[in-house]
């Protein structure tokens, strides 16, 4: 029988205090049957992305413990960072990897949301495949106004009523929980400190503004450099190299260039192979030509 593997990639609103990050990771790692694969902290975004995998019961319990720990240690009234956010645990996506379906992940998201709402008294919004409201499928729509805006609206605006939990915000804010396919978090840095250029480029490449399908983008300023921060929601249909080349063309319009890029968290191997194939212009290439693919079979 195929082992069930589900990935969870929660984003926590803390990227500067190592003690807090370590405590959240420890809470997740303490669950039997869960393996933490990656921890990526960003001080400018003031955000940490943790990637872990496990079976359905273990992954659900680990996510709950991570959310509970974050709620104890992160005060959203004091939080500052470049990245949009709603709560101490901002977003918790579940991703089917092996022996699991999207429906399995939707069920986990709903169970976890109900528990977080009742036991931790944190408002929960379901998004992507788990959304109960079509208007909440897109994370950016759910997160609009961020923590500060939601705090003003949640009690009085019916459209901002959570799926689970109270219609009020405590210091842990709100949490968005859902199910989705694999996503690539990808950032590109420009040789300028003009954030308006990054914002214009982000507007050009993101789908919601008429750009590339399956691309979400923001223009930010990180460590004095303009950054185009992106989520690539379907790398099979909009590959990394297509995004890079479009940003290069857009940057040239403003007299700037791409100086570096970064991946946040883990990335599917095929996405990187597709990028290598494009830039190396390889003909007739197959995964059988990769040394490590044979070693993995042993």
Spans of features found by a protein language model:
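Long, contiguous binding/interaction regions
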Residues: 2-298
């Amino acid at each position: 029988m195929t082992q069930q593997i589900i990935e969870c990639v929660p984003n926590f609103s803390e990227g500067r205090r190592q003690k807090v990050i370590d405590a959240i990771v420890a809470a997740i790692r303490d669950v039997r049957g869960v393996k933490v694969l990656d921890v990526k902290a960003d001080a400018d975004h003031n955000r940490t992305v943790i990637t872990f995998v496990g079976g359905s019961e273990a992954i659900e319990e680990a996510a709950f413990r991570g959310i509970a720990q974050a709620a104890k240690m992160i005060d959203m009234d004091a939080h500052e960072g470049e990245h949009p956010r709603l709560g101490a645990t901002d977003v918790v996506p579940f991703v089917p990897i092996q022996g699991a379906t999207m429906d399995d992940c939707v069920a986990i998201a709903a169970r976890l949301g109900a528990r977080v709402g009742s036991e931790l008294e944190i408002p929960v919004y379901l998004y992507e495949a788990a959304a109960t409201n079509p208007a909440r499928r897109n994370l950016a729509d759910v997160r609009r106004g961020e923590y500060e805006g939601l705090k003003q609206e949640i009690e009085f605006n019916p459209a901002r009523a959570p799926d689970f939990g109270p219609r009020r915000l405590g210091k842990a804010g709100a949490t968005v929980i859902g199910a989705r396919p694999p996503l690539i978090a990808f950032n590109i840095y420009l040789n300028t400190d003009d954030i308006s250029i990054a914002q214009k480029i982000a507007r050009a490449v993101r789908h919601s503004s008429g750009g590339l399908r399956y691309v979400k983008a923001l223009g930010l300023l990180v460590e004095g450099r303009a950054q185009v921060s992106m989520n690539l929601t379907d790398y099979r249909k909009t590959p990394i190299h297509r995004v890079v080349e479009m940003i290069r063309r857009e940057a040239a319009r403003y007299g700037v260039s791409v100086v570096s890029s970064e991946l946040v968290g883990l990335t599917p191997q095929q996405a990187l192979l597709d990028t290598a194939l494009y830039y190396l212009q390889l003909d007739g290439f197959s995964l059988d030509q990769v040394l490590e693919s044979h070693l993995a079979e042993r």
